[in-house]
Design a protein with these regions (language model features):
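A short, Lys/Arg-rich alpha-helix, primarily the initiator
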Residues: 1-28, 62
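Short, conserved catalytic or interaction motifs in soluble domains
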Residues: 51
C-alpha cells in the first residue's frame, strides 16, 4: 500500500488570537515559561502563538486549555483557530 505524504498548510491565525492567549495566561497567573512547561510545549512556540506568528494544532490547543483558565468564548476562539494534527506521531506522516 502506497503512503502519501501529508502536508499541513500554514494558516495565519486570527489577529485577536495571540493577544487573547497572552491575556488569558496572565489572568490565570502564569508566566510564559511556566505555562509552556505545564502545557508541554516549547517556550519559543508559546511566544510565536502569543505574537500571532503561528496557529496552534488541535493537540496544543487542548494542552493550553488544560492549564489556562479560558472563558467559553476564548476557548471557542482557540479551537476555531487550531489546525488538525499532522505532527511526527500522526499515522499519515511518513517515517524518515
Amino acid at each position: 500500500m502506497e503512503q502519501r505524504a501529508v502536508v499541513r498548510q500554514r494558516q495565519i491565525p486570527p489577529v485577536t488570537l495571540g493577544p487573547m492567549l497572552g491575556t488569558a495566561r496572565l489572568r490565570t497567573g502564569l508566566r510564559g515559561r511556566e505555562c509552556a512547561r505545564l502545557a508541554g510545549i516549547d517556550h519559543a512556540y508559546l511566544i510565536r502563538l502569543e505574537t500571532g506568528q503561528r496557529a496552534p494544532s488541535r493537540k496544543v490547543a487542548e494542552q493550553l486549555g488544560a492549564v489556562i483558565a479560558f472563558t467559553a468564548e476564548e476557548r471557542a476562539e482557540l479551537f476555531a483557530a487550531s489546525l488538525p494534527d499532522v505532527g511526527k506521531d500522526h499515522p499519515g506522516k511518513r517515517a524518515a
